[in-house]
Amino acid sequence: MLSSRIPKGKLLKQTSATSYLNLAKSMPITTARYRPNQYYANELAKLNVFTIHNIPSPCFSQVRNFHSSFPRKLQMQQTEQGDNRPALEKFGSDLTQLAKEGKLDPVIGRDHEIRRTIQILSRRTKNNPVLIGNAGTGKTAVMEGLAQRIIRGEVPDSMKDKQIITLDLAGIISGAKYRGDFESKLKSILKEVEEKNGKVILFIDEFHLLMGLGKAEGSIDASNLLKPALARGKLSMCGATTIEEYRKYVEKDAALARRFSPVTVNEPTVEDTISILRGLKERYEVHHGVRIMDSALVTAALYSNRYITDRFLPDKAIDLVDEASSTLRLQHESRPDAIATLDRQIMTIEIELESLRKEEDQLSIDRKHKLEKELEVKKSELKELTDQWESEKRAIDAVKNAKSELEKAKYELEQATREGDYARASRIQYASIPELQDKIQELSKNELAAKSSNLLHDSVTSEDIAGVISKMTGIPVNNLLKGEKDKLLDMNILLRQSVVGQDEAIDAVSDAVRLQRAGLTSENRPIASFMFLGPTGTGKTEGGKSLAQFLFNDKNAVVRFDMSEFQEKHTISRLIGSPPGYVGYEESGELTEAVRRKPYSVVLFDEFEKAHPDLSKLLLQVLDEGSLTDSHGKKIDFKNTIIVMTSNIGQEILLADKNTYEDGHINSEVKSQVLENLRHHYAPEFLNRIDDIVVFNRLSKTALKEILDIRLREIGDRLVDKRIILQLTDEAKTLLCDMGYDPTYGARPLNRVLRKKLLDPLAMRLIKGQVQENETVKVEVKDHKIYVVPNHSEGTVIEKEEDYFKEDKDDN
């Protein structure tokens, strides 16, 4: 036993616990040769205490029991934790070995970055590249591509037979409880690398974590431990980090930064991303057991670039394909809806049959026979569908297994070629692989032949990609997939259903949106920007909301700002956030945060002329470049927003009777006067960036009647829950229009009239019981006033159906 080899302590005359502890501390620990590793000094110090003879029981009542089991527990710990592997093997992962085993995804493109990395690694000193790029652009893939090239021998002679080891920084730092533990681990790694004589390239992902790693009181961090080896060229290291983290952490340490040569990994183009997706397609098909259509790959690249603006290609496009494939795979593993529906119907019939089993009347017997026949038919349908589902699953699994075998055969071909076994390589290339390809083609052909009647959808299509986009961004799928031609041609008609009497404004908005959708405007600008001018109550704000309904299928997709809150200059900072040193710096800007959370919305600046003039300067970048930088330095994307500014500038010109026709329309001369008035308020560079300035007409009586119909439909929607139908006579509608018509105030007086003359009396009728649920309410004119006709006398209460049955049950 281990305890028998530890030197025995001397007998003490004192009986205090402190005396025994002091003795244990003074005893030399000479058992290092019995330990499999160097991290058990603390446990052996404890064991020294327990090996002291004649410890009085009052001092340590449980010491003797623990002493007998401690060596065995220590040996178990040593068995579990002891690890005599080399440090590189313990704390690293061999990328070249993974590439040799075919476990790395193929790397498409990135030739320039890989070649630049090889050039730096081939230097005599400071042969340390650091890959810098945005998250998701493929920095780690560059090193994986280099590992694959080393295995295939597609590198210069100086790079052949080299190993790329990925260091696990978390594994190095974990367990380093005492001062010196971390340093000894790292030094052992560096020693092993130097012993390899330049055959090992260390790769550290999240390279900026080296700064301060292992830093504690009286110790130095990892970056300072690495500097001497990096400078001498004895250590070849490659790092990967983002641009922001490199600037924030690495560049501050000039001594470390100069030992590395940056390699910029830029975001690939959409075309390059499509090529990358095509290269990864087979891996994802084998993993998920589905077929990925080429159109889905193109859609993933295009839609991710257009709609996911806070991430980078190719990562976001790969995620779309992966999630769509995963969703389809889960559908294969779950029961189809048709089978689940039949199963529920069978359960319902069986429950009803059980309740009718004891009934003896003729009606129940007939019902029971009918249900038994129906149950038999349903069970037959269920069995047929279940057999079909299992058959389709087997067919899909067969294709998946064949593709897996094909991938394995390709790996074996590459391995045989690399090892020089050309006979085996020939058999695989000209026999096994063609046979598997024919098998996959035949299985896929059988699937396509029965596709019309299939329960399972086995191909990832553009619709599946659009569904994932919809979940991630909130854009309705039908907006992405519906033919843009039909939708845009109907835009004028759809907008006129909610914005009345403003045909010219609707046409201007529709034309601007069509221009953008046709791709004839700059992609770096917002979808469109408008300034709506006109008298109050003419539908300027409603126009912005209707635009949101058309584009985003959500009338609430409007980020609205009341400009009366931004009259002072200092309040403008609320939109982008307070500068450093001011109260509220930690909080995000109201405008930037709203657009970041809802990037697909209509941004409405209501009553724009009431804001401070400097606000127009803030919007110059938004209108021209489609972006705005907040107080934290984050760039917010406005490319998928529509900017709408409403203003009452020039309304005194529009309200003059001599300047408008009877139908409320204005002529071009009056419009020119309004625009001239606008130029006195805003700088030319601001007005020049707005796509279109729309002048709204004054509302006519005809337009007000259409608005009344819209408001009555809205009131009817509110009464649906009470199952009340509202009916107005033509006379009542005409009287309401006459009472609510005021050219100066637009449609808002009509809302007040409806509330005072219609809704308030209707509320009184409901409260008094004169109008009940599930009834029709008539509204007519009586004595030249709006009159809501009561259906019952005051205080009348009709029993509800459930109350009637409740009373009947109580009587029984």
UniProtKB/Swiss-Prot annotation:
Listed CDD domains: AAA, RecA-like_ClpB_Hsp104-like
Compartment annotation: Mitochondrion matrix
Name of the protein this chain belongs to: Heat shock protein 78, mitochondrial
Domain notes: Has 2 AAA ATPase type nucleotide-binding domains (NBDs) per monomer. NBD1 is primarily responsible for ATP hydrolysis. NBD2 is crucial for oligomerization.
Gene name for this UniProt entry: HSP78
Transit peptide per record: 1-73
InterPro entries to which the protein is assigned, alphabetical: AAA+_ATPase (IPR003593), ATPase_AAA_core (IPR003959), Clp_ATPase_C (IPR019489), ClpA/B (IPR001270), ClpA/B_CS1 (IPR018368), ClpA/B_CS2 (IPR028299), ClpA/ClpB_AAA_lid (IPR041546), ClpA_ClpB (IPR050130)
Gene source species: Candida albicans (strain SC5314 / ATCC MYA-2876) (Yeast)
Region (NBD1): 88-336
One GO CC term on file: mitochondrial matrix
